[in-house]
Amino acid sequence: MSTNVFDPPALEKGTLRVIPLGGLGEIGRNMTVFEFDGKLLIVDCGVLFPEEHQPGVDLILPDFEPIRDRLDDVVGLVLTHGHEDHIGAVPYLLRLKQDIPLIGSQLTLALVEAKLKEHRIKAYTLTVEEGQEEQVGPFDL
């Protein structure tokens, strides 16, 4: 039995777990983790912009804590499009583990690479076209 709220029970082989880390009930911080056969695939990694009642706050990041000790299990980060609420937190995630492959369209990856350049981070990227299928770890994209 799990005693830590961030330590969910073990999955049976072949079972998919979906872990939303942001973006639910808010416009921003979009980040969802899919777990399958011990591997993690992240979809989006965005920021939330603060509201007027949050002076001094520049950006609000997704909560990386549930996956912080599992970053070696991450097989990729799929970026659906280039809006800040989907890509804005990528540099902060890559500061924790820089070799996570980024997967997205040519335009989306160009926007992310410009952002990463500001942070002096060089990422491994995989450009995909519409309709293209890829195998990333145990995940079929």
Which role fits each region the language model picked out?
Residues 1-19, 35-46, 107-141:
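Metallo-beta-lactamase
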Residues 7-8, 19, 61, 100, ...:
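Intrinsic-disorder/low-complexity coil detector
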Residues 14-22, 27-36, 133-141:
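Catalytic core of the metallo-beta-lactamase
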Residues 20, 29-31, 89-90, 112-113, ...:
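Short beta-alpha junctions and helix-cap segments that line functional grooves
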Residues 24-29, 36-79, 91-100, 104-108, ...:
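Pre-active-site segment of Zn-dependent metallo-hydrolases
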Residues 86:
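N-terminal Rossmann-fold NAD(P) dinucleotide-binding loop
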